[in-house]
């Protein structure tokens, strides 16, 4: 075991001497690394952060612009929907108004047709009544003439006209009753 311990102690300084061959070189390497890190951070990290920050600002600006455009588009859609709804309401109102106007015109036309039919019917009734009166007058005149002729032939004597007319009128009045 001692042999093992001696090899370990003997090997440790070799590793340390292998890792740190020269202390001044090691310190110089550490200082050079620190200087490199400081210089690189000043030359690279700050511009890199600035580029990242600019990129982040550009992305935020684009997102903000997209949100604004989306909002404007939504407002436009709402306006279009409102216009569409107004157009539907207006067209419905126009259709209802047209139906009411058509019903009014239909009623007016039917009323005028009934009035015209009544006028034609009344005129026809008047014409029929006039024709009837005219025919009745002609029939009465014909009957009177036939009666005069018959009476004249029967009596074979001439009776004066006023007396004949009086007799015939009395006869006709008795016929009407």
Swiss-Prot record:
Transport recorded as keyword: yes
Subcellular localization(s) per the UniProt record: Cell membrane
Keywords per UniProt: ATP synthesis, Cell membrane, CF(0), Hydrogen ion transport, Ion transport, Membrane, Transmembrane, Transmembrane helix, Transport
CDD domains linked to this entry: ATP-synt_Fo_b
InterPro entries tied to this protein: ATP_synth_b/b'su_bac/chlpt, ATP_synth_F0_bsu_bac, ATP_synthase_B_chain
Annotated membrane topology: Single-pass membrane protein
GO cellular component: plasma membrane; proton-transporting ATP synthase complex
Alphabetized GO MF terms: proton-transporting ATP synthase activity, rotational mechanism; proton-transporting ATPase activity, rotational mechanism
Regions crossing the membrane: 19-39
Keyword Transmembrane helix: yes
Subunit comment: F-type ATPases have 2 components, F(1) - the catalytic core - and F(0) - the membrane proton channel. F(1) has five subunits: alpha(3), beta(3), gamma(1), delta(1), epsilon(1). F(0) has three main subunits: a(1), b(2) and c(10-14). The alpha and beta chains form an alternating ring which encloses part of the gamma chain. F(1) is attached to F(0) by a central stalk formed by the gamma and epsilon chains, while a peripheral stalk is formed by the delta and b chains.
Function: F(1)F(0) ATP synthase produces ATP from ADP in the presence of a proton or sodium gradient. F-type ATPases consist of two structural domains, F(1) containing the extramembraneous catalytic core and F(0) containing the membrane proton channel, linked together by a central stalk and a peripheral stalk. During catalysis, ATP synthesis in the catalytic domain of F(1) is coupled via a rotary mechanism of the central stalk subunits to proton translocation. Component of the F(0) channel, it forms part of the peripheral stalk, linking F(1) to F(0).
HAMAP family noted in UniProt: ATP_synth_b_bprime (MF_01398)
Family to which this protein belongs: Belongs to the ATPase B chain family.
Name of the molecule in the record: ATP synthase subunit b
Organism for this UniProt entry: Mesoplasma florum (strain ATCC 33453 / NBRC 100688 / NCTC 11704 / L1) (Acholeplasma florum)
């Amino acid at each position: 075991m001692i042999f093992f311990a001696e090899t370990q102690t003997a090997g440790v300084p070799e590793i340390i001497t292998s890792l740190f061959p020269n202390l001044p070189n090691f310190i110089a390497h550490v200082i050079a690394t620190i200087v490199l890190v400081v210089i690189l951070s000043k030359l690279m990290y700050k511009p890199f952060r600035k580029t990242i920050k600019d990129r982040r600002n550009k992305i935020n600006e684009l997102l903000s612009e997209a949100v604004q455009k989306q909002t404007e588009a939504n407002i436009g859609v709402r306006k279009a929907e409102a216009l569409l709804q107004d157009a539907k309401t207006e067209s419905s109102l126009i259709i209802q108004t047209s139906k009411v106007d058509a019903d009014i015109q239909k009623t007016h036309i039917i009323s005028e047709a009934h009035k015209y039919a009544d006028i034609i019917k009344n005129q026809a009734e008047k014409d029929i009544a006039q024709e009837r009166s005219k025919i009745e007058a002609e029939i009465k005149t014909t009957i009177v003439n036939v009666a005069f002729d018959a009476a004249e032939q029967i009596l074979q004597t001439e009776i004066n006209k006023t007396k004949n007319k009086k007799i015939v009128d009395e006869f006709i009045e008795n016929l009407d009753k």
